[in-house]
Amino acid sequence: QRELGYKIADDCFALLLSNDFCGDHDSLNIQALVHQLLQINSPLITNEILSSMRRRILDNTCFDTNNYNGYYFTPLDFVSSSSSIWYDDVKHGIEQTFDFWFDNINEQGVWNPNFSWGIDSDVSRQVNENWKGYITVKRAKILLAFDRIEF
């Protein structure tokens, strides 16, 4: 299993360090890998890895709130507290993202997904409700971490 883990990490870091396309979901998943490896003080995490992770986060972060209703990753998709090592990289977009969230919470007190399934069916409506719950819990945890709400 260790060898498989190293192979996966090597593949992820090869993409991270390259100039190949590395989209928002790829970057978010690699960021989660880097975060976990940092927690165990892995020698796989080098300054070059951290620098490339910063580059990918910035490449995939939208700072224009006019686009937030579209399918874009915001600063708070990559940073969930001010203790994140990537906080300084995106901090200039944090408050505007909070403002957007508060301006766009719906009458039920939850947030709608910024995407659609392209169909209207019982299943798509149920999945949409599930996503509302996921988004709301995730955002509530972030708001709590930034002392923007009280529990």
Language model features by range: what are they?
Residues 1-151:
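Preference for long, amphipathic alpha-helical scaffolds in soluble/luminal domains
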